[in-house]
Each structure stands twice: as C-alpha cells, then as structure tokens.
C-alpha cells in the first residue's frame, strides 16, 4: 500500500497529534453530513494529486464505539479520492470530540469551498449555530455573528440561510438551482408546510416568476393566519409592475477618466454596489 510508505505507520500531526493509517472500510461519513461529495472535475484533480503526492493533509476522525469503526469529521473528499485511486487506507488523526465539537470542525473544514449549494450552507450554518448554543453561546444574533465570521458572511446572511432549512425540499431544490432568490426563499420559509405546498401547486414548477414582493405578501397573510389556497393563487397570479432604472452616460461620465469604456464604467459601478450591499448587510 502506498500510504504507509508515504506516512509510515505513525507520524506526528502539526500539534503533536499522532497520524495513523486507517483502512477506508473502517471510516464512515459524518452523521447528517450536509455537503455533497460529487465525482466532478474537482474530484478528478484531487485524484490526480493523490496519485502523485498521496494524501498531504490527514483526515480528522473520531472513534465510533457503537459501530466499532471511525466517523469522518473532516476528509470526506479525500476518502473518496482514495477510493477512486484504488488505495485501501488513508492517513488520519483520531481525536476525542463531543458531538458539538465535531460539528464545528466539520462545518469549518468545508464552509470555505467555492461550490457550496445554498442548501448545504443553510444546514451547515444551522448545525453550527445549534452546536455553539449547546456550548453555552447565548443570543441568536451573536451566535450567527460567530458562525458568519468563520465563513465571511454577516450575521444577517447567516440567519437568512438558516431559514432555508425550513423550506419544502422542492422549494429548497429550486434555491439550489438558482430558480428562486435567497430573499424570496427566506420569505417562503415562514409559511407552513401546507402553505408551501399550495405555493408549489400554484406555480406548477415555474417558481422563477415569484417576486420578493409576492413572497412578502404570502408571508404577511400567513402570519395573519388568513392565507388560503385561493389567496396563494391570487397573490401569485397578480401582475407585478416591473421596476426599470436607466441612468444616462451624461450624468455619470464626470466620475470616470475620459478614456474609460462603457464596460469599465459598469464594472466600477457594480463593484461599488457590491460594497454598499455588504455594508447594508453588516448594519442590518
């Protein structure tokens, strides 16, 4: 086996922890692991790296005495890469962790990935918030702030993502595929399961037509306990007046160098809008 040659039967981790080589058959996924492990292009790159260099960063696992094996805390993609490479073992650090400690490590080791779906981020944030709450961190806003700090999101954004975990699975799937915005999905999450079912029935799969104002109207009717199936249909089928904003080049040209092209101006404007949105998020 290539791994014992690369790592030896036992090495030391960065903090003096022992690194051991464990059979892949003795490793199982983290309970309620919210992240996908797809066989995509990035996995192909990981497999190539494993073939060339081996596993450079050991997985983190904990002993599962009930099953007589180990639960992966961090390293699900590395394990899959080892399987695809044909290896039978992989290096790992075995730690004694509580359920809450394990959740926090699991989330933090995955949350910075670029290809995370809204549903994955939503469940990861919720799991970490619950874990921190169990550890004595008080206050939803403060807990959300701690969770967001590790992921580069503000507390309000974290709370909005957590709301997605209360969505009908079909509506959550729409959010994953970009058919509904985070703002609309958040509003719909306050509806009961039955009410969300009415929304799906009325939309017939065409959820992209639902605007934020319509979603807000649905939420308000639900909170007032006056939302019926007919009311859902009336709100969704209501024609919404679209807002269109046009800014003439004459009004903004003085803010840019004379040699700036239209595309360069647009790029600067959108960068400024993104900065403004981030500040608004932090203040909310």
Enumerate the language-model features and the residues they cover:
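Amphipathic, charge-rich alpha-helical segments that serve as recognition/docking helices
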Residues: 80-166, 190
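Short, charged/polar connector segments at secondary-structure boundaries
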Residues: 1-95, 106-112
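Amphipathic alpha-helical extensions and coiled-coil-like segments
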Residues: 123-131, 145-146, 155-278
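Short acidic DE-rich linear segments
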Residues: 4, 278-284
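Short polybasic/polar patches that bind polyanions
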Residues: 51, 83, 149, 175-176
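Glycine-centered loop/turn motif at secondary-structure junctions
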Residues: 54, 86, 152, 178-179
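Helical mechanochemical/support elements of P-loop NTPase systems and associated helical scaffolds
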Residues: 23, 39-42, 46, 69, ...
